[in-house]
Amino acid sequence: MARPKLHDFRRIVVKVGSSLLIDSGAGEVRATWLAALAADIAELHRDGRDVMIVSSGSIALGRSRLKLPRGALKLEESQAAAAVGQIALARTWSEVLGHHGIGAGQILVTLQDTEERRRYLNARSTIAKLLEWRAVPVINENDTVATNEIRYGDNDRLAARVATMASADLLILLSDIDGLYTAPPGSNPDAKLIPVVDSVTAEIEGMAGAAGSELSRGGMRTKIEAAKIATSAGTHMLIASGKIDHPLKAIAGGGPCTWFLTPANPVTARKRWIAGSLEPKGTLTIDAGAVTALRAGKSLLPAGVIRVDGQFARGDAVIVRGPDTHEIGRGLVAYDADDADRIKGRSSPDVMSILGVSGRAEMIHRDDLVVGTAPG
């Protein structure tokens, strides 16, 4: 597959590691470098692209502000350092993006937020609303509450999960190396940069070293794992050097990097997962008007639902049937079974008065809905 161009992509996640963002000697943000990156992000934003940032650095910034000694931190020390660093990190991103008239929204996530469907939907909705408002979500693992048993441990895989969650079509991992090499370039003069990876094979995985630093928990192995997550969900990924000023501009200009390509697109991959990999927990029967709307690519609104069967939680997969009981499709429902039954047949403005809270306008959003024949 040919190497893509940066301008081919509409929704982009940019991951920035601690070793790029923080000067390891001074323990402070590399302000000049970050200003250049923010200018690159602003240019993409002006061109109408959705941009999200997955930013490391909270622990590194916190330990600097607290003047902690070098060396490994215990879990509770890391959590406390992150509590201080997250404030500084959020302020930093807000200021550099604000210089370009762009609002920044901080989102702190844990492993469960991307693995438990209800929390997944909440996080995805927050990201979607920020993007709708033309803000830039700045996402980090919530190191203040994550434990060793329930954490990512690196932001490469977190970035891949965020890209999947947001249906991004490109994930950029800015690193201290400009891509995947056939051998460690620091010790092997014959090492060659691999410009395009069509599939993550055992051979590709074997090329990943274990390089990391005191400030950064990740290495090439975690980047390969991120590539597997991203490409399986229909998101292209690339690794490029962030050690230069204006790294995104360099990528756009054809600079050295490694592309990990996928034949699918995010929406197709996600809908394949909904249709074939999730066990339905219930059924929604809808009227003829709703059937027509769904087949025209619309979301399913409460007004179109005439019957609710089964016991399901918010975020579970359900079958959608027409008035003749024929299966119309499958999707992830935005309400649990009890609430869905209470608001069926009612207009969206009635939902708040019935439930006492402001709920989703849709029973199933079109991005969470697969309309077609039932899987075999």
From Swiss-Prot:
| Record GO biological process | L-proline biosynthetic process
What the protein does comes down to: Catalyzes the transfer of a phosphate group to glutamate to form L-glutamate 5-phosphate.
The compartments listed are: Cytoplasm
Protein name (Swiss-Prot/TrEMBL): Glutamate 5-kinase
According to UniProt, this protein's pathway is: Amino-acid biosynthesis; L-proline biosynthesis; L-glutamate 5-semialdehyde from L-glutamate: step 1/2
Q: Which GO terms describe its molecular function?
A: ATP binding; glutamate 5-kinase activity; RNA binding
Query: To which protein family does this belong?
Result: Belongs to the glutamate 5-kinase family.
Repeat recorded as keyword: no
Chain residues that bind substrate: S56, D143, N155
